[in-house]
Every structure is written in C-alpha cells, then in structure tokens.
C-alpha cells in the first residue's frame, strides 16, 4: 500500500510471502499448525473507505483458504492495521487527522485485531505531544463515543461491501496463483516482477492525482492558500525506486511543484501573483474563476479573487498593467468565441511577457489564440504537474529578467 500498490496486490503478495515462509519452515522440519496459531499480519490501511473494509475481510477469507491447503482448519491469528504513509500530506497537514480517522474506521469495520494510528505530523516532524495525544484520542472516540467496539461484524450482509469483498478476493486469488506459477514470492521479487507490477499501479495513481481525478484535499484539490510552509519541509519529488520497496507519500510529485514556488519566494522575497480576469456570462465566469483558483492554488502562488470587468478589452488592459505575474481569462465559451482573441491581442499590446492563461478549452479558436500570444489553457483534463511546471518556468524567467 505505502509503495503505491492496490488492495488486490497487497493481499496477494502478502499471501505469496506467507506461503514462501511456510515452505521454508516446513522444509526445515517445523510443524505448520503452530505457525498459523502464532501468525501476525500487519497491513497499511488507506483512504478508500469501503474498499479498505472489504480488503481486510478478503484477506481473512483467503488466509483460511491457504491454511486449508496445509490441513489447518482452526487457528488463532492476528491482523492489525496501520494508518498509511501513502495517503498523508505535508501541505494542509491537519487533513491527515481526517484521513487517519476514516482509515481507522475502515480497519475496525474490516474486523482487525488492532489499529496503530500515526500522529498527523509524523511525515514531516518529530510528532509533538499534542499530535500524539490527538492520535490516541481518535481510537478512544471510535471506541467510547462511536461504539465501534460494541458490535461484532456490523458490515455483514451489506451488499456493496459483500460484493467488493468477493471481487477483491477473486482478483487477489488470481494474482496469488500467477505469482506462485512464476516460482513463488522469492523468485518473483528477485526478478523484480512484483516491483514492476506495483510500479504500474503506482504510476497510474500518480497520473490520476496529477489530473485531479484522484482528489486529495489540501494537495491537488482545495489547497490552503493561507498556509505558510517552509521549502525544507517539502519533497523534491520521488526518488527512483530501488529493488527494495520504499514507503512514500502519494503527494511527492505535487509537493515538488510547491517546493519550487517556495524556493523562489525565499529567493526574491515575493510570492508570484495570479489574477483572475472575468467578464461576460455570470455563471460561467464564476465557475471558471473558482476552478482556476483551485487549480493554480496548488502551485503555492498567491491567487487573487476574481475581478469582474465590463468587457474583454477593459479586462485585458487593466490585467496587463497590474502587478500580477499570471493572468487567467475567465468567461463562457460563447464569450470566448466573440472576445477572447480581442482580449489576447489587447493584452499582448500592453504586456508581451506576463503569463496569460485561459480557463476552458475552446478548441475551435485555440490555434488563433496561441498565435496571438496565449500561453496555455487550464481545464478539467489538464495535468496539474505539467501545466504548473511550465507556468513556473516562465514566471521565474520574467522575475529574474526584471532583476537584471
């Protein structure tokens, strides 16, 4: 989980590793049944609430299926959960409290024997007495106030969870068998088959985060623009994966984007400013301004609330001569068809260097807009990491040119 795997992989590889250990111990003359009775499994628990519940249920089901192949039908084992590293963030870190709470709830409803809840600041600080106390209080609240310890298997019979459990079990069993067919856990790991399979899932997750299809509050969605954060706390991005799987946060690549901004701020003692220049249709200009505020806030730039103008020409003149570093055109598609080209031409006649963006994707006129001087568009399908990286490069170039 903390290296970017999905729940199916987590279960399958855990069972593959178990079978490898059992076979090794059996070859050395040890009895299998006592091993099962002393078995302890700990898994990270992520933020996909219902799927994580199903994961622990599926694990127990498949564990008993494995034990039966060794002639063990009744045994006492323990399964514990630990709140994941993958789901935690450095920016807007108090959101980690909410993630840790829902993760603990998932694990408990999945019928684990214990849950370790990390402090919300564990990923970037030595946990403070306050953060440790809050982490401990989460389990106390779930037990004493929410009565999670009073009902046995409360999710039994819930259709969605039962279906998810069945599907995860089937897929995990198929993956488990495929690894065994390759010679088992040791061979698959030594040949880096497992690492490659995890890497494929990890890259897909990171891609979805960068496209904001996998939302993470405070990271790629709803960034806290009031937050002050030191560049030293932020990641420089993911390091190349080694043969040994290394736990990491999902947010590393986006943190690196924020770090670039914070380093620039420390160098020039000024935070780059984004201006949202709105005109035309009220509903669409507000919707696109809100989207732009959220999207560009990920960068760590100072994003001004939208400014509404009577016309595209007025908006272009005023925003071109303001002290902002980035301007975003916000309006409706019909308004873009009628006025966007005028906006870009007027803007560039007053300022040839400032970053100029458009919120939306008017494909019919996009070539003409870019030829006139539009830098880029931001829209629902934009890749936040790639787009902001390009904006940062031009902003840095413009600011440093002014210093010369």
What residue spans do the PLM features occupy?
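Short acidic/histidine-rich active-site segments
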Residues: 111-122, 148-155
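Peripheral docking tails and interdomain loops at the edges
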Residues: 341-404
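Generic long, charged, amphipathic alpha-helical segments
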Residues: 266-267, 274-329, 339-350
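Conserved, mostly hydrophobic/aromatic
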Residues: 63, 110, 138, 157, ...
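Helix-rich catalytic cores of soluble enzyme domains
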Residues: 1-106, 122-136, 389
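Intrinsic disorder at enzyme termini
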Residues: 113, 174-272
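A structural-propensity feature for long, helix-poor, extended segments
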Residues: 135-138, 142-160, 323, 334
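Long, amphipathic alpha-helical stalk/connector segments used for oligomerization, subunit docking
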Residues: 148-168, 173, 179-182, 186
């Amino acid at each position: 989980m903390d290296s970017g795997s999905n729940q199916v992989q987590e279960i399958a590889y855990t069972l593959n590793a178990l079978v490898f250990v059992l076979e090794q111990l059996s070859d050395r003359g040890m009895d299998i049944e006592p091993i099962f009775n002393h078995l302890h499994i700990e898994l990270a628990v992520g933020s996909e609430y219902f799927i994580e519940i199903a994961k622990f249920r599926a694990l127990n089901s498949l564990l008993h299926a494995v034990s039966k192949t060794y002639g063990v039908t009744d045994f006492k084992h323990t399964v514990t959960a630990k709140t994941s590293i993958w789901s935690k963030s450095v920016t807007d870190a108090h959101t980690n409290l909410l993630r840790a709470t829902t993760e603990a709830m998932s694990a408990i409803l999945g019928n684990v024997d214990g849950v370790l809840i990390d402090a919300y600041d564990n990923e970037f600080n030595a946990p403070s007495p306050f953060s440790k106390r809050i982490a401990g209080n989460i389990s106390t609240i779930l037990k004493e106030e929410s009565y999670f310890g009073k009902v046995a298997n409360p999710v039994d019979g819930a259709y969605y969870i039962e279906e998810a459990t069945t599907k995860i079990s089937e897929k995990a069993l198929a993956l488990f068998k495929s690894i065994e067919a390759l010679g088992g856990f040791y061979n698959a790991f030594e040949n880096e088959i497992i690492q490659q399979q995890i890497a494929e899932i990890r890259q897909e997750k990171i891609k979805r985060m960068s496209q904001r299809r996998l939302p993470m509050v405070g990271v790629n969605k709803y960034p806290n623009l009031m937050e002050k954060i030191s560049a030293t706390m932020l990641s420089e991005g993911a390091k190349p994966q080694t043969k040994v799987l290394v736990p990491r946060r999902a947010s590393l690549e986006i943190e690196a984007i924020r770090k670039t901004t914070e380093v620039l701020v420390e160098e020039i003692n000024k935070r780059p400013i984004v201006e949202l220049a709105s005109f035309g249709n009220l509903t669409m200009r507000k919707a696109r301004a809100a989207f732009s505020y959220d999207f560009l806030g990920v960068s760590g730039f100072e994003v001004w609330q939208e400014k509404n103008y009577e016309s595209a020409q007025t908006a272009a003149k005023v925003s071109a001569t303001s002290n902002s570093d980035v301007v975003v055109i916000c309006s409706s598609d019909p308004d873009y068809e009628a006025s966007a080209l005028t906006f870009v031409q007027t803007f560039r006649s007053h300022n040839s260097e400032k970053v100029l963006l458009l919120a939306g994707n008017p494909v019919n006129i996009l070539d003409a807009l870019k030829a006139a001087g539009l830098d880029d568009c931001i829209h629902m399908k934009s890749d936040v990491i790639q787009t902001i990286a390009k904006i940062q490069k031009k902003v840095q170039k413009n600011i440093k040119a002014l210093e010369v």
